[in-house]
Amino acid sequence: MKSFALSALSTLVTVFALGNAHADVITQWTFNSTTPDGATGTGSVLPSVGTGSLSLIGGVTNPSFNSGVGSSDPAASDNSGLQTTTYGSQGAGNNGRGIEVKASSVGFEDVVFSYDLRHSNTSSRYELAQYSLDGVNFIDYAVFDGGLGDTWFNARTIDLSSIAGADDNANLAFRVVATFAPGTSGYLASDASKTFAGSGTWRFDMVSVSGTATPVPEPTSAAAGLAGLAAIGFLARRRRAA
């Protein structure tokens, strides 16, 4: 009887734990043209999946779109990336220039933010990734090293699965900003043979917010589980009566 009860309880726990166990894309920017036109120099800053906003901060500009070839975008053609520049002068604007992304995680848990980034030769070698739980105050997550010029660095990741308050949050936000070389008061160029210039470019692609849908038991499964509990109770009462 005991082994049966434990087995039934284990099954019930499994039933109520069932849900969407894989990560889903909540919001994503591929920067490809909404209507494919075969030109990588055109694109869109509207999300290709979900809803959210992406903005340039600190005076950074977007002079154009450019090829996303080399990023993780699976598009065989019409693969665009968001070209950004105007990162300021040497020694100024530390942690203040880059992009800001806002996307709700309501209905999701184990949230992850990821992006691909191409550093030009004279762009800032180091980028600081930040997150915000209220959309206003940002917390440093990690400094990433882009130590090769004219190179894509794919799947940069901010994993918030262990951060209290990131799940089911309508005010979630992220930033990727140029930062001084660690322990210094200035920027380094991605190509060690070059000198940093604010006119250097960062090109973004596959900017994504992902998460696991909050598990909700299916009605039929839940009913079956409750029926199992009722059966356990009935057998227990019958055993006591015997």
Task: Explain the meaning of each model-derived region.
Residues L18-A23:
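Sec/Tat signal peptide C-region and signal peptidase I cleavage site
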Residues I26-T35, F138, A142-T214:
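Terminal, low-complexity interaction segments
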Residues T34-N66:
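Short, tryptophan-glycine- and acidic/Ser/Thr-enriched carbohydrate-recognition patches
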Residues L54-V106:
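Surface-exposed, low-complexity/disordered Ser/Thr/Gly/Pro/Asn-rich loops and linkers
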Residues S105-S114, N169:
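Extended extracellular/luminal ectodomain segments enriched in beta-structured repeat modules
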Residues G107, R118-R125:
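Extended, low-complexity, turn-rich repeat/linker tracts enriched in Gly/Pro/Ser/Thr and Asp/Glu
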Residues A129-S132:
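Conserved Ser/Thr-centered positions that define the repeating blades of beta-propeller domains
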Residues E218-A236:
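A short, hydrophobic C-terminal helix/tail in secreted or cell-surface proteins
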